[in-house]
Amino acid sequence: MLKCIKHEYGIKNMKSIRNFSIIAHIDHGKSTLSDRLIQLCGGLSEREMSNQVLDSMDLEKERGITIKAQSVMIDYKNKSGNIFNLNFIDTPGHVDFSYEVSRSLAACEGALLVVDSTQGVEAQTLANCYTAIDMNVEIVPVLNKIDLPNSNADKVAKEIEDIIGIPALDAIRCSAKTGEGIEDLIERIINDIPYPKGSINSPLQALIIDSWFDNYLGVVSLIRIKNGILFERDKIQVMSTGKNYYVDQIGVFTPKKLNKNQLRCGEVGWIICGIKNIIAAPVGDTLTTAKNPAKNMIIGFKKIKPQIYAGLFPLTSDQYEMFRDALGKLSLNDASLFYEPENSVALGFGFRCGFLGVLHMEIIQARLEREYSIDLITTIPTVIYEIELINGKIIYLDTPSNFPNMNDIKIIKEPIVECSILSPPQFLGSIIKLCIKKRGVQINMVYHSHQVLLKYNIPMNEVILNFFDELKSVSSGYASLEYDFKYFQSVKMVRIDILINSEKVDALTILSYHKNAQSRSREIVDKMKKLIPRHQFDISIQAVINNSVIARSTIKQLRKNVLSKCYGGDVSRKKKLLQKQKDGKKRMKKIGNVNVPKTVFLSILNSRES
């Protein structure tokens, strides 16, 4: 039986502290393992326990994924009777949330590499593990789900050694579901993961590893004390801005919020200091005391730039201010979310937002709609292009409607990503066909015992929309994907403008690879013809490249039968009525506006269908 105790402050020896992350692929059991550690170490009573304790967002529980990094502090008494203070951080596994993983690793000395013993190593496991190795974090391999009948721990241990290249034959074998092997795991954490380095007597240095906004308390920051001690009521300084604040509250999560009067060197906890401005405590910044400030900032994790961009517009204009405030609060929670105001003739006022991937975009949109009750229209996602103009100037653009005239452009370069795909060998042919269809170039192919590791360079524009879905489809769900930006490469792209009755609709302007331009244009034009309601006059829909129409369709007018009351008589009377109607339609077309409902844009701009 585990000898675990409820949290009580009093561990003054840094050698008794262990800070570690749990990194793994989606659905390999990291959140369940976190729950088991909390339950067995007395963090919560049986009544307070629920599945996925650390996945606090409803979206996380619904999708069965972890989005935000969560921290917990528990105490453990080992077999020798010594008390150890364990701080662990549950991290996401999806490729779009890798920045959360790097953030957690910056606060740790060790990481549990959790691998499902029924599935083996996945591409994202590989990426996260290499990130941990680059950050000099001690890796402890853990083979989970050994209680399942199809578990093959020996095979998976060999896979870890072959593919990742770290020793794994003595990896901890456990079941987060039943609790088997958890005691051995905790002992391994204590023995293998090094204690924090730092000096309790040095000036305070605290790394902000996460922040979120509380409607009542303001900004709450999760911090790791690298040097010194932080006391309640201390006057602290944010080193990047030089601004000073008084500490109102400090404490730890057990996972319940527990107030303390100090945080010591090596510990991970939360801090509230009355910050109301959501950009005043940026993630990755360093806190120090105003009285005795540290000389240097802590070198934190690499700040990750957005990979894709899309326009977000409220369905009704009266929600704009609420939308702006909501984005401000979400951006504090999410260091990679970028946004700036954007104005569209068709969609009104909104924001141009930067995301790490399509899932990241969907999560942000879902949170805005659910937590803030804002109905949104999202434009088709695009990537950043490097453009060299005729005059030699180089610019970077992500908005198709802002692209200069094609005659002024010398070279367009698109971002290329290196995709690492792990799959069983039987799906290799289908995956290679898919990569070729997406304009991919094969870099490497390595056969391991039961899996093949494929490396392809593919344009990011092809990857961000539905490549992941198609990959899962052709591999029956077995293939996994991880990608990383490599370089810009010249490409022949064209800008397609959509015109309705000769008026350009900026929200529908897209960039396309020149060979796909005709089919994409025809697809959008045909879709619009079905969705736009008929008017009293003809509506022409055109797709245009450099003033040349490459696709066109016409929505025929609604036409009243003006001859319904003419039962006979002179034919000139009928001609006169028809001519009068024709002249009226001409006048109406000149002065009439085409009413395009916003629901039409919602349907056309659906990224999955586009």
Swiss-Prot record:
Matches recorded under PROSITE patterns: G_TR_1 (PS00301), G_TR_2 (PS51722)
UniProt-listed InterPro entries: EF-4, EFG_III/V, EFG_V-like, EFTu-like_2, G_TR_CS, LepA_C_sf, LepA_CTD, LepA_IV
EC numbers on record: 3.6.5.n1
GO molecular function, one term: translation elongation factor activity
Main localization of the protein described in the UniProt heading: membrane
One GO cellular component term: plasma membrane
Its membrane topology: Peripheral membrane protein
Subcellular location(s) per record: Cell membrane
Signal peptide segment: none
Catalytic activity: GTP + H2O = GDP + phosphate + H(+)
Keyword Cell division: no
Enzyme class label: hydrolase
Key words, A-Z: Cell membrane, GTP-binding, Hydrolase, Membrane, Nucleotide-binding, Protein biosynthesis
The tr-type G domain, residue ranges: 15-197
GO biological process, alphabetically ordered: positive regulation of translation
Protein's UniProt keywords contain Membrane: yes
Binding locations of GTP: D27, H28, G29, K30, S31, T32, N144, K145, I146, D147
Family as reported in the entry's similarity comment: Belongs to the TRAFAC class translation factor GTPase superfamily. Classic translation factor GTPase family. LepA subfamily.
Function: Required for accurate and efficient protein synthesis under certain stress conditions. May act as a fidelity factor of the translation reaction, by catalyzing a one-codon backward translocation of tRNAs on improperly translocated ribosomes. Back-translocation proceeds from a post-translocation (POST) complex to a pre-translocation (PRE) complex, thus giving elongation factor G a second chance to translocate the tRNAs correctly. Binds to ribosomes in a GTP-dependent manner.
Name of the protein described by the UniProt record: Elongation factor 4
Source organism of this protein record: Buchnera aphidicola subsp. Acyrthosiphon pisum (strain APS) (Acyrthosiphon pisum symbiotic bacterium)
Biological classification of the source: Bacteria, Pseudomonadati, Pseudomonadota, Gammaproteobacteria, Enterobacterales
Gene: lepA
